[in-house]
Amino acid sequence: MARYRCCRSQSQSRCRRRRRRRCRRRRRRSVRQRRVCCRRYTVLRCRRRR
């Protein structure tokens, strides 16, 4: 749910530039890293949603 919301909030150009491989690795690190993960994970949702 958080990934989807992040994707909608982020821009498509920004979503395309982010990566989702590092997000998976830094997923259970800290609450602050969770936001970064959402921004990087957004790439996968933005690309498949559009």
Swiss-Prot record:
Which GO molecular function annotations are given, in alphabetical order? Answer: DNA binding
Q: According to its UniProt record, in which tissues is this protein expressed? A: Testis.
Task: State any GO CC term.
Answer: nucleosome
Record's subcellular location = Nucleus; Chromosome
Q: What is its main location?
A: nucleus
> Biological process GO terms, please?
chromosome condensation; sperm DNA condensation
PROSITE patterns according to UniProt: PROTAMINE_P1 (PS00048)
- Keyword annotations of the record: Chromosome, Developmental protein, Differentiation, Disulfide bond, DNA condensation, DNA-binding, Nucleosome core, Nucleus, Spermatogenesis
User: InterPro entries in the record, alphabetically?
Assistant: Protamine_P1
* Top-level taxon in the UniProt lineage: Eukaryota
Q: Which Pfam families match?
A: Protamine_P1 (PF00260)
Annotated S-S bridges: 7-15, 38-46
| Role, per record | Protamines substitute for histones in the chromatin of sperm during the haploid phase of spermatogenesis. They compact sperm DNA into a highly condensed, stable and inactive complex.
Quaternary context: Cross-linked by interchain disulfide bonds around the DNA-helix.
State the similarity comment. Answer: Belongs to the protamine P1 family.
Q: What is this protein called?
A: Sperm protamine P1
Species:
Equus caballus
What lineage is this protein's organism placed in?
Eukaryota, Metazoa, Chordata, Craniata, Vertebrata
Whichever gene encodes this chain, its name is PRM1
